[in-house]
């Protein structure tokens, strides 16, 4: 049921693009010595809002075991049940099964300028590309209408479609990080922002983490406690040898100590989705949004690869009618799915990660 208007002719992404090498890019330029790398790492931490006090408290929690893979697991005495009727609103048949009143409430909110879209695009698609270090939002991932389209273009097309249906322009925000901000900004300039008529913002990250050496406790838990496929004898010996070497390295280097013996960018990590809403405050994007739309009340926040997410008037109206601060979208779980899911834990409705299951 998701619809969008994709740009055509000279407004769409060209079939081929010539890109000049980036002098500051990965692997470019002469090698740097350890002192220069340390200075660069310190500079990156300072520029991206590294909080040493929070980092220090996290290290203490990791060393004490308060934060660990094992402590994340629910107690074996926990009662875990499936959700019950009333825990979720079924939208699997599309917004048609929601009330007309919900649609009218949602349409009024959209035309009143009360909604903006925030697309989380700060990641480098490490799992998706196997560690290629790309900017996922800029990837021309699908051929639609005869041309390959990027995630950015598709999401802007959906906001454009909803806005044009109701005669308004919907503000759209893309969150970025130290990994993606420069590339995203340059790309949007090159494609003239896909001629998006509404307000368009980039929300650069203002929090960054410094990687730590893993603890032996967590390594052993991940390898010995969690289920995994057993390999043939020779492959299993090789895997066990590699893991034994990693445990020795963690002990010798210092468990939960800062990981700095690598390229500076490899020592940092984005802090995760939770921090993107506070980032809107820290980097001034929310202030700019409110100056543009003082009546703004609701944000639709979604991952850059959640292609079905768009401002649906009926779903928006259902959220507003509920009077709740947050409405989360969940999908039906299949047996082979990995990740989190919705369940009742000891009678309370919770989103539970698969790693936390007893």
Residue map of PLM features:
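Conserved phosphate/anionic-ligand binding catalytic regions in large, soluble enzymes, centered on
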Residues: 121-127
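Domain-scale recognition of functional cores that engage charged ligands
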Residues: 91-119, 133-358
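Low-complexity, highly charged intrinsically disordered N-terminal segments
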Residues: 1-100, 109
């Amino acid at each position: 049921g998701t619809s969008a208007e994709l740009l055509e002719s000279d407004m769409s992404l060209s079939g081929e693009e010539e890109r000049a090498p980036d002098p500051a890019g990965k692997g470019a330029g002469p090698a740097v010595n350890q002192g220069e790398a340390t200075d660069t790492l310190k500079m990156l931490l300072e520029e991206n809002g590294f909080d040493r006090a929070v980092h220090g408290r996290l290290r203490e929690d990791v060393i004490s075991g308060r934060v660990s893979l094992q402590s994340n697991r629910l107690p074996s005495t926990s009662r875990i049940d499936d959700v019950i009727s009333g825990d979720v609103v079924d939208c699997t048949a599309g917004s048609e099964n929601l009330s007309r009143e919900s649609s009218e409430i949602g349409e009024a909110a959209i035309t009143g300028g009360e909604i903006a879209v925030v697309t989380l695009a700060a990641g480098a698609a490490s799992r998706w590309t196997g560690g290629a270090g790309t900017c996922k939002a800029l990837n021309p991932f699908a051929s639609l209408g005869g041309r390959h389209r990027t995630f950015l273009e598709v999401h802007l097309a959906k906001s454009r479609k909803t806005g044009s249906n109701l005669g308004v322009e919907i503000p759209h925000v893309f969150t970025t990080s130290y990994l993606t901000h420069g590339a995203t900004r340059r790309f949007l300039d090159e494609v003239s922002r896909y001629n998006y008529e509404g307000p368009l913002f980039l929300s650069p990250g203002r929090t960054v983490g410094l990687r730590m050496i893993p603890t032996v406790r967590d390594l052993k838990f991940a390898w010995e406690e969690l289920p995994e496929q057993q390999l043939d004898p020779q492959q299993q010996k090789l895997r066990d040898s590699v893991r034994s070497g990693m445990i020795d390295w963690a002990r010798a280097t210092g468990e939960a100590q800062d990981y700095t013996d690598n390229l500076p960018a490899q020592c940092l990590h984005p802090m995760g989705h939770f921090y993107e809403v506070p980032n809107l405050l820290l980097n001034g994007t929310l202030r700019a949004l409110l100056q543009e739309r003082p009546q703004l009340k609701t944000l639709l926040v979604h991952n850059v690869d959640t292609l079905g997410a768009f401002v649906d008037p009926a779903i928006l109206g259902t959220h507003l009618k509920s009077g709740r601060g947050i409405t989360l979208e969940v999908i039906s779980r299949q047996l082979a799915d990995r990740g989190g899911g919705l369940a009742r834990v000891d009678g309370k409705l919770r989103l539970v990660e698969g790693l936390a299951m007893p």
